[in-house]
A protein has these predicted regions:
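Conserved short alpha-helical segments that host acidic/polar catalytic motifs at enzyme active sites
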Residues: 1-378
Length: 378
């Protein structure tokens, strides 16, 4: 049912690829992976609409690059629905900060999606960001670098790599439903998905953020018909684009069983109790890996119903997977290894090289505001 890689943007490689395609990039830029219709007229219309929405957000399309692919790496059935795949490179104005560019890319992508997918369901933007890029499709894992020669190019380097192989249980295989999505990959099921989607839709008219002044542009906040994982990714993205960091957003969506942990730190309990008033848990068996391009991490559901094991090596590599042995390390290289516990979150900051343990993350979250006082006062 597909697989993929979500990478921290491999800047050096993408600049070389853009230059080879005659595309001039600014100091910071966005790049999108786009599934287009194989009908040239529909593909051209989609490009034009996406360009128009980007222009509305003050962004300029620097150019399009046809992504090299090898259809022979696909199975017979996946070749029947194989889309045309291109990368779009986007330059911001000189005075637009990278964080602002991310939000403008987000709004433009959402608006273009509303315009295009109603007439062309093949169209899909895998990622459109200045921080990450997503390579995925309906291929077997061993065939992914054969399908995408970019991934077999030694010039492509990244400090974050999220991999997922999908076995769908509630949707039919489709190119766009392969994982990872734009922020996360999910092993499990969201058993509360119908309620989560309905509440997200019902509350969308009360959500507000000064960073997203016109929320109507991005509704619906989550898709109502795709996989549960894709809807969870939608919700996480909305929270992050609205100004919430990835740690608080993820702990709102996938909290631990804080009500039943007898000896939980009172300040940490207050954090979860306060935030539980804003959004319901997206509950069910869940092992999630995620990244925003700076932080990469893993979180387990409150019951720990999906496995997650980690290995840390002396050359400062962190590997988290559902099984030990995904990557072969010599025993003398390993400085720490273990199993994540129910409700825990583990992460790394690749810009500082800091490992963020579950205790580090909890301490940061509980210390941001006087949650206990707020609860007593209200």
């Amino acid at each position: 049912d597909g697989c993929g890689l979500l990478l921290r943007k491999p800047d050096a490689f993408l600049r070389l690829a853009a230059a080879e395609a005659g595309i001039k990039l600014s100091g910071h830029y966005g790049v999108g992976m786009v599934f287009l219709n194989r009908d040239p007229a529909l593909a051209a219309a989609a490009r034009a609409d996406l360009r128009a929405e980007l222009a509305q957000e003050g962004l300029t399309v620097a150019g399009w690059r046809v992504v090299p692919i090898n259809p022979d790496a696909c199975g017979e059935e996946s070749r029947k629905t194989l889309p045309h795949i291109e990368q779009v490179f986007v330059n911001p104005p000189a005075d637009m900060l990278p964080e602002a560019m991310e939000r403008h890319l987000f709004v433009a992508r959402r608006r273009a999606n509303q315009r295009i997918r109603a007439r062309d369901p093949v169209y899909y933007v895998l990622s459109l960001s200045g921080r990450v890029i997503d390579y995925k499709g309906l291929v077997m894992p061993a065939s992914l670098p054969e399908f995408y020669p970019d991934l077999d190019d030694e010039r492509l380097e990244s400090s974050i790599c999220l991999f997922h192989q999908r076995f769908s249980t509630n949707t039919l295989p489709q190119w766009w439903l392969a994982q990872p999505f734009r922020y996360l990959a999910h092993n499990g099921e969201i058993n509360t998905i119908r309620g989560n989607r309905n509440w997200a839709e019902a509350r969308s008219y009360t959500f507000s953020s000064p960073l997203l002044p016109d929320m109507a542009k991005i509704r619906p906040l989550v898709n109502m018909t795709g996989s549960d994982s894709s809807s969870l990714d939608n919700m996480l993205e909305v929270l992050v684009m609205g100004g919430m960091d990835i740690f608080r957003a993820m702990r709102l969506l996938i909290p631990p069983a804080w009500q039943n942990i007898e000896h939980m730190d009172p300040d940490l309990r207050a954090f979860y109790e306060y935030n539980s008033m804003h959004i319901e848990p997206w509950d069910g068996p869940a092992g999630i890996v995620l990244t925003d391009g700076r932080y990469a991490g893993c979180v387990l559901d409150r019951n720990g119903l999906r496995p997650a094991r980690y290995v840390i090596t002396e050359d400062r590599h962190l590997t988290i997977a559902s099984e030990i042995g995904v990557h072969d390390y010599a025993p003398e290289q390993v400085i720490a290894k273990g199993r994540m516990k129910p409700g825990e979150m583990l992460a790394v900051d690749v810009e500082t090289g800091r490992l963020l343990t579950p205790a580090d993350i909890d301490h940061d979250l509980k210390s941001r505001h006087p949650y206990r006082r707020w609860l007593r006062g209200h």
